[in-house]
Amino acid sequence: EEENMTQSRTHTCGSLRITDVGKQVKLVGWMENFREVGSNLGFVVLRDFYGTTQIVATDEEMVATFKGITKESTISVSGEVRERSSKNDKLETGDIEIVPMQVEVLGKCRFRELPFEINRSKEADEAIRLKYRYLDLRNAEVKNRLILRSKVVAALRKAMMDHDFMEITTPILTASSPEGARDYLVPARKHPGQFYALPQAPQQFKQLLMVSGID
């Protein structure tokens, strides 16, 4: 079958199972770790949004290739799925590993030493976490909170829609209406010297909707 050149990967790092043994696959992810066992054997943990997959380098050339790649670099790995000799029951992909035939660095991480270990980012200083937020969000625990929030919001929205509620989005820029708090002003591009403000509450917009008959 001819390869689709527009497809960056055939599977995610969390999708391969024992039933995929023998398949030729292509994964894209961040190199979480490389453990060198010998000159012709090494293990890579490849991670993306969906999980991790073990890559096993079985020759000197491939071991040298992975040794030259910094942690958290974005790489593409093409190879064959095989059954692991020692399985990891804690991982959904723990029954398999990939024997790579081709490795391509898509984006090299410029840090030889990361500002913090990805899986322990919550222990880092808050200012450092915010500065390198894109690394912090690769932490599964942090990422899963975003996923949970998305599911909760979706469930609430569905429940409200099932009760015939209608979702309305009110403007995020309006005329300034100073109250107790200071307005956050945004200059008007077409009207020099005038400003929009972030609304402190959607009260007026909701009242307009009620007068319009939307109850």
Residue spans for each PLM region:
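Class II aminoacyl-tRNA synthetase catalytic cores and aaRS-like
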Residues: E1-D215
